[in-house]
């Protein structure tokens, strides 16, 4: 089921913001109702061993910098497109989805119902995260717990992000994944960065700092590479080519 802490931010419209299109909220309410009905039943059905072994947890960065437009139209849109392509092509195995900013939340536990994950994915944005910031460590810890809860002795973790701000804590969390659940990083964004355009529900303005200057988040590839080297994670840059999906469509060796 969806993380209870995230549910209010998915379903409740903050009164201090302008009104938003109700269709995504209605869609999400429908999806949640389906999950509520199906959840207990699916948990009682043991998954085939091969399906449990081909388990993938996708970890999506929902910090404000993901609204930067240095990759058109934004880092977040490109990340969602990549996840969408992956889910549509991934016909076997179980997939889970976690989002993180200042904390981490499970959008979906490990499941073979990719259509439901896709429906939830379209609604996600930084403005719904309860805590600001960028903390990868709790997301990696949560990923491991999803594998354990699903009875998956092996699996893979794919993190789509533009930074690793809490490297020491994230390294500790990554070490707990060990060889059972190897970690991969997919970086989205550029070294030059770009302004962060806020969504229409927040006035369609650009994010500014306390001095009124535009916030332009640049991707520090060197820092991410250092984290990848220290954690043993593989590292790639996000692109939307279909051939880049092949590694995620085959069960791990």
Regions found by a protein language model. Give the residues of each.
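Short, well-ordered secondary-structure micro-motifs
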Residues: 108-110, 168-171, 195-199, 248
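Solvent-exposed, extracytoplasmic
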Residues: 165-178, 185
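Von Willebrand factor type A / integrin I
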Residues: 178-253
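A cross-kingdom signal targeting lumenal/periplasmic-facing segments of multi-pass membrane
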Residues: 156-160
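Juxtamembrane linker/hinge segments adjacent to transmembrane helices in membrane proteins
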Residues: 1-30, 34, 248-249, 253
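Solvent-exposed loop/turn segments at secondary-structure junctions
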Residues: 64-65, 102-106, 163-166, 189-193, ...
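Short, glycine-rich, amphipathic interfacial segments at transmembrane boundaries or analogous
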Residues: 5-8, 53-54, 197-202
């Amino acid at each position: 089921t969806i993380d209870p802490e995230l549910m209010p931010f998915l379903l409740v419209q903050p009164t201090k913001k302008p009104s938003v299109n109700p269709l995504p909220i209605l869609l999400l309410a429908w999806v949640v109702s389906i999950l509520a009905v199906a959840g207990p039943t699916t948990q009682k059905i043991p998954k085939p061993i091969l399906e449990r072994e081909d388990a993938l947890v996708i970890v999506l960065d929902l910090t404000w910098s993901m609204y930067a437009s240095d990759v058109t139209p934004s880092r977040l849109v490109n990340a969602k497109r990549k996840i969408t392509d992956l889910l549509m092509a991934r016909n076997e195995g179980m997939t889970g989805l976690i989002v993180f900013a200042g904390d981490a939340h499970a959008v979906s536990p490990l499941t073979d119902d990719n259509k439901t994950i896709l429906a939830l994915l379209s609604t996600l944005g930084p403005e719904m995260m309860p805590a600001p910031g960028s903390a990868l460590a709790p997301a990696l810890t949560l990923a491991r717990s999803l594998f354990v809860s699903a009875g998956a002795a092996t699996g893979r973790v794919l993190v789509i992000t533009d930074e690793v701000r809490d490297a020491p804590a994230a390294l500790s969390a990554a070490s707990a994944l060990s060889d059972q659940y190897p970690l991969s990083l997919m970086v989205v964004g550029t070294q030059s960065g770009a302004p962060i355009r806020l969504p229409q529900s927040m006035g369609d303005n650009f994010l500014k700092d306390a001095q009124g200057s535009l916030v332009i988040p640049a991707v520090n590839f060197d820092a991410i590479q250092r984290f990848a080297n220290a954690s043993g994670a593989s590292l790639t840059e996000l692109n939307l080519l279909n051939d880049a999906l092949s590694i995620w469509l085959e069960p791990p060796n």
